[in-house]
Amino acid sequence: MKEEKKLLLREVEEKITASQGFILLRYLGFTATHSRSFRNNLSGVSAEFEVLKKKIFFKALETSGVEMDPEDSEGHLGVVFAYGDPVSAAKQVLDFNKQHNDSLVFLAGRIDNASLSGREVEAVAKLPSMKELRQQVVGLIAAPMSQVVGIMNSVLSGVVSCVDQKAEKTQE
């Protein structure tokens, strides 16, 4: 193996090891402008996009001890390495696809040490984020509390009203 390829292989191995997960993509009609825009979007969620040869990527997976089936990935691969939350990176891919006519196709991925198919990665990307889930839970907790406060407020205003009426009757 040439020295350049060995260096690239080591670099990819390091990215696989350092990342929380990765997503394999096929890119169709992906221009330089799209690539720049996509990379900028991913940097906001601590992820990066690399175009790699299939052979080098799967060799790096093998030497890193990660098992994954190459599936139907041919030629060059687009790989998103997620150093933060891999689900957020998957969401960025999904959002980018909506804006750019599905120019990226999910092939496979690895999230939380679990290998996923392209469909599974896409399904994970469609789930609510942790932030959205927290907001929903807070909303579920806050709604009954606000109802209790409203009921207590109406009970107290009823008591005040009753006392006012009693005071008016005694003054008459």
From Swiss-Prot:
InterPro entries from the UniProt entry: Ribosomal_uL10 (IPR001790), Ribosomal_uL10-like_sf (IPR043141), Ribosomal_uL10_bac (IPR022973), Ribosomal_uL10_bac_type (IPR047865), Ribosomal_uL10_CS_bac (IPR002363)
GO biological process: translation
Source taxon at top rank: Bacteria
SUPFAM superfamilies (alphabetical): Ribosomal protein L10-like
A GO-annotated cellular component: large ribosomal subunit
Family, per entry: Belongs to the universal ribosomal protein uL10 family.
Complex formation: Part of the ribosomal stalk of the 50S ribosomal subunit. The N-terminus interacts with L11 and the large rRNA to form the base of the stalk. The C-terminus forms an elongated spine to which L12 dimers bind in a sequential fashion forming a multimeric L10(L12)X complex.
NCBIfam families: PRK00099.1-1
Protein name, entry field: Large ribosomal subunit protein uL10
Organism per entry: Chlamydia trachomatis serovar L2 (strain ATCC VR-902B / DSM 19102 / 434/Bu)
